[in-house]
């Protein structure tokens, strides 16, 4: 038996061959994931991780990002990982790679070239993910890499997202 603790205990029973069975959908840990810098490695990490179907048996991922950018990355990486577009984290579907579309703005993707536009997209994703986490929509928040210089704006004056989250949540 494998037990994972985070807000609640989740048990994965094993069969005779000692292989994990799929947990009940309601038992899966919900993981909110900020997209990070749209010109960085965030989507590559996320999409490649969840292209393994076994990962979707362990958790319910919820990306906070940009659907068009995610699809661009999928196509560029040659991945067929389907995305389940949802309006809010509470609508996440177990067994799917869920994405909450944080913006309908057109975003130009240039790999390895962070800019103010990709920094603002990273901030919007992080802000919406943090708000949903604070409201209890999911169990764990994972942040994809950001450009610490390009994410800076009037609302984000921190060294990085760790400091932003510390300021936002304090000792929670």
Residue ranges and their predicted role:
Residues 2-169:
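Contiguous, glycine/small-aliphatic-enriched amphipathic segments in soluble metabolic enzymes
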Residues 172:
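Active-site neighborhood for divalent-cation/phosphate handling
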């Amino acid at each position: 038996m494998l037990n994972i603790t985070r807000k609640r205990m989740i048990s994965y029973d094993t069969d005779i061959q000692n292989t994990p069975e799929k947990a009940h959908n309601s038992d899966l840990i919900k993981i909110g994931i900020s997209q990070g810098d749209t010109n960085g490695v965030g989507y590559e990490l996320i999409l490649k991780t969840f292209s393994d179907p076994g990962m979707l048996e362990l958790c319910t991922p919820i990306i906070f990002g940009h659907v068009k950018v995610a699809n661009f990355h999928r196509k560029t990486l040659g991945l067929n990982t389907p995305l389940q577009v949802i309006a809010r984290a509470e609508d996440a579907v177990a067994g799917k790679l869920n994405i909450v579309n944080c913006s309908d703005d057109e975003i130009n993707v240039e790999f390895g070239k962070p800019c103010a536009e990709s920094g603002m997209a990273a901030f919007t994703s992080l802000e919406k993910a943090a708000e949903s986490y604070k409201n209890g929509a999911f169990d764990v928040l994972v942040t994809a890499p950001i450009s610490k210089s390009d994410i800076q704006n009037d609302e984000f004056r921190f060294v990085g997202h760790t400091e932003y989250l510390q300021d936002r949540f304090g000792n929670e």
